A protein has these predicted regions:
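PLP-dependent amino-acid enzyme catalytic core
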Residues: 1-447
Length: 447
């Protein structure tokens, strides 16, 4: 069975269940698999005939081993992935992978829904309960809240930066109630994420059975490898190499793709497209990593991350080490990274122009995050020449970002059914000022 180690070097190895329920390693590191299983080409060549949940089983089962019986895991996957995953051809072998058809219209649904089912399975097995503490820059909170909504033995606390989420993103978190507790933080996403990490490391809270549903949790990360295999099976059934362009904020999505690559997926290269928070593209150019503090406010708000947590995993994948503060302890193999990743930073101006161009040229509505990915792909094709097939990830429904889209295209994106009644529901959330001390006081008083 595959064991998981901490990126901060903690010696103890845990199985998938231990890593999933802990969320973060005791030394504040992130869990990474000690080895990555390689899927045979025979298995991968069978994927074009498989459904999404069948592909997911092949990709995820090696990490879980015998911890979940085959029928139970298949049922969870079928239940988690009951929605369509369309590939939209834009032009000449260039596709959009639409990851916005889940219940909260965001790619975060793919990871959150499976993780919720796995956590509930393990908790029921042991008769335990847990508190999920998670930070969001926009879409994670709603996906996690909906995935865990109403589940027994699990309470969910979501921290979000009050002034940096759209009204619809906020309403998706604050209109649920029951076991969901949203907290509006006076600050940025990085502040929310730092408070969550501090809570995990606080000995005073050790009795609370805290876990995370951010992409610091390995249970969020591994399901993200699946949609790369799925997309490849649909656009390159003959096994050709594919270019993937990935809008990148906290870098969980890119890590999912890199894990798929290391598991045997034929990939030409990944485009890591960030917004103006360009700490990673600068690192790829110079070899020096400097977090951006505070992060810059861009219209692709879910990617306003000045120090992406998953860089610790990315560095580990290439033989390096980074601690939770962003300090580089051991440099990764930069030449190997550059062979597999092309990193670009896309300005708000270019993002807006991309939204306009996609609509006028192709009648495609992109929201700001998907536009960053699409702009990154166009930059790649200009620099390295045409490549087919190429897939860019569209990570959220345009209806989540109506203001920019109406202003740029004149089109008011239609509300998907999952969001249609949001405006009528009552909101319920707490405002939290005062940094970590306020969060700690809240946790100790109410939980």
């Amino acid at each position: 069975m595959i064991k998981f180690f901490s990126t901060n070097g903690h010696q103890e190895r845990v199985d998938f269940k231990g890593a999933l329920l802990a969320g973060q390693a005791p030394d504040k590191g992130l869990y990474m698999p000690e080895s990555l299983p390689i899927l045979s080409q025979e298995i991968i060549q069978g994927f074009p005939q498989m459904s999404y949940h069948q592909i997911a089983y092949q990709v995820i089962k090696p990490y879980i081993g015998e911890l979940v019986a085959e029928p139970a895991l298949l049922d969870m996957l079928k239940d988690a992935y009951s929605f369509d995953v369309p590939l939209e051809r834009v032009y000449d072998g260039k596709y959009l992978l639409r990851l916005d058809r889940g219940p909260t219209c965001s790619f975060k649904d793919f990871a959150a829904r499976l993780m919720a089912r796995l956590m509930q399975y393990f908790l029921k097995e042991e008769g335990k309960s847990i508190i999920i503490l998670t930070a969001t820059s926009g879409d994670t909170g709603s996906a996690v809240a909906h995935a865990f909504y109403g589940l027994e033995n699990i309470r969910v606390i979501v921290l979000f930066p009050e002034k940096e989420v759209t009204e619809r993103q906020r309403r998706q978190m604050t209109t649920l109630g029951k076991n969901i507790y949203p907290l509006a933080v006076a600050g940025k996403f990085d502040d929310c994420q730092a408070q969550v990490k501090q809570a995990f490391a606080d000995p005073d809270l050790a009795g609370l059975a805290l876990s995370s549903a951010n992409s610091i949790n390995i249970g969020r990360l591994l399901p993200q490898a699946v949609y790369y295999f799925y997309a490849h099976s649909r656009v390159a059934p003959g096994g050709e190499k594919v270019v993937f362009s990935v809008p990148s904020g906290n870098f969980g999505d890119l890590m999912g793709g890199l894990i798929a690559l290391k598991m045997g997926l034929p990939v030409k290269q990944f485009v890591a497209a960030t917004n103006e928070n360009d700490e990673f593209p600068l690192f790829m150019q110079t070899g020096r990593y400097e977090p951006i503090q505070p992060s810059k406010n861009c219209i692709s708000n879910a990617m306003n991350v000045g120090h992406p947590s998953n860089l610790a995993r990315l560095f580990a994948l290439y033989g390096g080490q980074m601690d939770e503060s962003g300090r580089v302890i051991r440099q990764p193999e930069l030449s190997a990274m550059r062979e597999e990743i092309y990193a670009v930073s896309i300005s708000d101006e270019e993002t807006r122009q991309t939204i306009k161009d996609a609509y006028t040229r192709h009648m495609v509505l992109l929201e700001p995050h998907g536009a960053v990915g699409w702009a990154g792909l166009q930059r790649y094709l200009r620099e390295f020449g045409d490549w087919n097939p190429a897939v860019s990830l569209e990570t959220a429904d345009p209806a989540k970002f109506p203001d920019e889209i109406v202003r740029l295209t004149g089109i008011n994106p239609p509300l998907p059914p999952a969001m249609a009644s949001l405006d009528e529901k009552e909101e319920n959330y707490l405002r939290m000022a005062g940094g970590y001390a306020s969060l700690k006081e809240y946790l100790m008083e109410f939980f």
